Every structure is written in structure tokens, then in C-alpha cells.
Amino acid sequence: MIIAIGCAAGRIMSTLGLPFAAINTDWRELENCAADSKLPISEFGLGAGANPVIGAQAAEDAAEAIATLCMESVLLVAGLGGGTGTGTAPVVARIARAQGCEVTAVVTWPFPFESRRWAQQARRGLTALQAYVPRIVVVKLRELLPLPPATRLRDVFEMADHKAASAVMDTLRGP
């Protein structure tokens, strides 16, 4: 089962046309996601406000529902740095491992221009994820830089989604 966690992962997986489940604290983003199964978490559905603690707590509160998504082998897809992907992914990984699932992850690392705070949160999120996931593919978005000066921000993030989608496909194909 592929589980996309957060806004970035939902966008990434929606480009691939593969079956997947999506978990998000932002219910509007979840609604627009192409997932086969959608699990809204959080009390109000307004996102985690770039706060991983809120993302983690929302996942803890939804642990039973998350467990129903975890079968045999789980591929987690998440963007690190913000609140939902960073905070929720380690909780989902822990739940999946507790059920005996083999867990792999593909995560994106923030662009250098996204902020020092996002880089720090990404580092902490990756460390938390490593406790439960033996194989993590980190897609470093800085590898897309430098960009032509006239590149729109929307296009930059679209390129990032495609780079991450390629990593997901490579991971599914195996070594």
C-alpha cells in the first residue's frame, strides 16, 4: 500500500495514476487529491500550520484508522519540513511496523529558499522516521537548482513533484 502523507505527497502521488491512500490534516487539499482512499485527520481540517507537533498529534488521535491502511508492505510518501508530512509520517511508520509491515519511505527535502526552520524540522522529522523505516529515499530538491530567472514558483514546485514521483517509481521497481 502506498500512503501519501500531507499536501506535497498528495500532489506527488496524484501525478502518477497509481492506487494510493492519502492522509492529511488539510481536508480541502485531501478532497482535491486523486487518492483511492482518503483519511482526514485533525480536529478542524485546516492543516497543521507547518507545525510537526500538530501533525503528529493528529496522527496519534487517528491511530486506529491509520492502522486499517497498513497492510504487509507500506510505502510512505511525504514532504519533510512542514507540519503534516514531517509530524505524521513517523507516527504512521510506527503504526505500520507495529503491525508487522515492511515499511519504506520516499521523502522530499525542502528547497534552500523555503526557510531555515523548515530545514531544521525536516532534519528532526527524518531522524524520527529513521527509527521505524530501514530504507528511506530522500529527494533533495536543491538538485533542481539553479533555475532560469523567469521560472514561476508554481513551476518550481511542479518540477519538484515530478522529481519525487520519479523516485517513487524507482522505489517501486526495486534495486
Give the location of each predicted region:
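Tubulin/FtsZ superfamily GTPase core signature
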Residues: M1-P175
